[in-house]
Amino acid sequence: MNNAGKNMMSSSKFYMGYSRWDEVKGGYETWEESVSRVMNMHRQKYASVMTPELESYIAFAEQAYKDKAVLGAQRALQFGGDQLFKHEARMYNCSVSHCDRATFFQECMYLLLCGCGVGFSVQSHHIAKLPQVHKRYEKKVKVFQVPDTIEGWADAFGVLFSSYFADGGSFPEYKGCQVHFDFNKIRPKGALISGGFKAPGPDGLRSALVKCEALLEALVEGTTGAVSVPTITAYDFVMHMSDAVLSGGVRRSATICMFDKDDELMLKAKTGDWFVDNPQRGRSNNSVMLVRDELSREEWANIMKSVKDFGEPGFIFTENKEFCFNPCVEIGMLPVSENGESGFQFCNLTEINGGQCVDVESFMRACKAGAILGTLQAGYSNFKYLSDATRQITEKEALLGVSITGWMNNPDVLFNPENMVKGAEEVKAVNKAVASLLGINQAARTTAVKPSGNASVVLGTASGIHGEHSPKYLRNVQMNVGDEVTRIITKTNPKMVEPSVWSSNGTDVVVSFPVESKEGSIYKSDLMGVKQLDYVKAAQQYWIEHGTNYELCVDPDLRHNVSNTITVDDWDEVEEYIYNNRKWFAGISLLSSMGDRAYAQAPFTEVFTAQQIVDMYGDSSMFASGLIVGAL
């Protein structure tokens, strides 16, 4: 088997997103050097409580990490060291919150700039708590000089919204003022900044502020009093902020917006000509919140018909409308402090390499290492920009999300119920021991299954709980045009690169890596519909449930979940199965069996040989223009 494409992907992902420039040696870090940097950061963080026992745990996890038996937080690889100590939110892959307070938008922008994905609820009972907006005075003008920091960029949005908020928001001195933003302090595009990154320049920020201001003006135009912010407008504010973050090229700006099942504007947010009229909406997944016991069979049938016909809306089953989920829906959270103040809560993720779990012993070793890494990460809660409620929420449950990628590479080991339970219990036990040494809380929930797009690329496994796509396929990866790795690939292999249709600012390209799967792999075609859902249900029952410390959860119904994408072969059968088993599911992405072509530049696109095309469609198929265009 030729693994050149997969190896190129792995190296590209590591050097593009995680390896740091070493000034001393005049080159980029190796894998082992990057891991050492992260683990030494943990040693520095916990120096005051270091004991021989704690060091033995750290050393154990470090070796497993270097062996790629596990991965720690990918944000730690990216930012580990002084950058992460400056902004400890950078430890976490994703965050969630209710959109229900004046500071939400600037805190959201801050987290996106830190590299965190954001899940946010615009359900009516949350949006109703936002301050109302009103017209500003035409002749009252104030200047805000934007500091060249992520706090400064976030503050710019705080100032803009405060100028409209009836209560003055978080910057009451700007209440009712026309705001002139001065970008002179922001370094020009391409200038070197800390961590080996390059400055994005002010254009993306300026554009997002202008677009958000236009939305606010549209709300107050023709009014004499204060008006409420609609759900769709609050959603678009975050989408424009996401575009500004993406222009910086630090990472993908991942978001998910959760809304009410009767919110017609949100239900239609990605219908019609949205791709032309509102391209910023491509930055999010949108999901309707469905309370399991309140969902009728008829309502479910209508939702599934829309999903089948239009691919929208996404949906999330929940026990409580106060619960929130990260963009990939594998972490369930309740981002409210004990005194009722809303804030953010975080996904604290580690990854087990299922491709290396060839027996119970190797699986248990990975479970132990994943738990150690996750517990070390859980202590990073010095959030200087965010509210104290966020710190309280994060420290209270001290969540872990020990995930497995490559389930289908060793299914006999990983899907054995006894092994799943044993592994989950090991994660809980190790977490309890290490948390005690660190002086932090034991985790309320410890196990999850994330989609593992980037992690599977680095480790060379199938993604998450999914099978290999096909024997041969193109793996389409979104990359920023300003990245050095992107420039090298474009120069040496230009036929692999094309402009991204998902980048409204033209800052991204798509690189198509040719991949040949390992012989004997379980492919997507072997895991259609209900068969794949059976695997998801089993992982939820044995891996997730047994990794939950129910007595430590702030709500006994809170659970982590299995992130999954199901290729549907029989829509009626899948509809019935999901409804009858909704207790075991949260979010499910449904893709038609023609899904490769349903979305432009889909992440995976199967490649057929000429003989396979003839076998499937007949001799004359080679002269069919549609197939020829598709093959090209």
Spans of model-derived segments:
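Extended catalytic cores of very large enzyme megasubunits
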Residues: 1-632
